[in-house]
């Protein structure tokens, strides 16, 4: 079994879901948290937001400063409509990079249905067909062929 750690970024790290994700992944033996991103509080330590986190982690930074080439996986814990914009910018430039989206952006394949439910246009409709909405434990084999995983939340 490989001892190599997976390099990850968490975008939306200071929100409610993002903080829980940071807390859980900071304890994972096969994960190296490389970036913790938010739109506010740049430069602050994550422990400012959650005292449960004991591990020394990178300070909060902007997603504009990410070196995508060193990452294996990106978690997105953003408001609906935001993850699709970021994934659209990065997806084709970094072909080995995978994404786990905790918003609703890739849960619904039909752009018209997405708009009727969330009241915003989906700005990356071509990527919807390249994503899977799934609980990974139930679709272990199918999930491997996708780089965008919409996680139920």
Language-model segments: residues:
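N-terminal Rossmann-like NAD(P) cofactor-binding subdomain of oxidoreductases
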Residues: 1-153
């Amino acid at each position: 079994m490989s001892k190599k750690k997976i390099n990850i970024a968490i975008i939306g790290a200071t929100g409610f879901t993002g903080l829980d994700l940071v807390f859980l992944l900071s304890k994972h033996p096969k994960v190296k948290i490389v970036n913790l991103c938010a739109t506010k509080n740049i430069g602050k330590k994550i422990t400012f937001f959650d005292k449960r986190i004991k591990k020394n982690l990178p300070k909060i930074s902007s997603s504009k400063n990410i070196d995508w080439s060193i990452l294996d996986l990106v978690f997105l814990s953003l408001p609906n409509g935001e993850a699709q914009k970021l994934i659209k910018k990065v997806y084709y430039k970094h072909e080995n990079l995978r994404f786990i989206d905790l918003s609703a952006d890739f849960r619904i394949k039909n752009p018209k249905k997405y708009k009727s439910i969330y009241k915003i246009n989906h700005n990356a409709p071509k990527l919807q067909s390249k994503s899977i909405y799934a609980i990974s434990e139930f679709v272990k084999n199918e999930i491997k062929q996708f780089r965008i995983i919409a996680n139920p939340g």
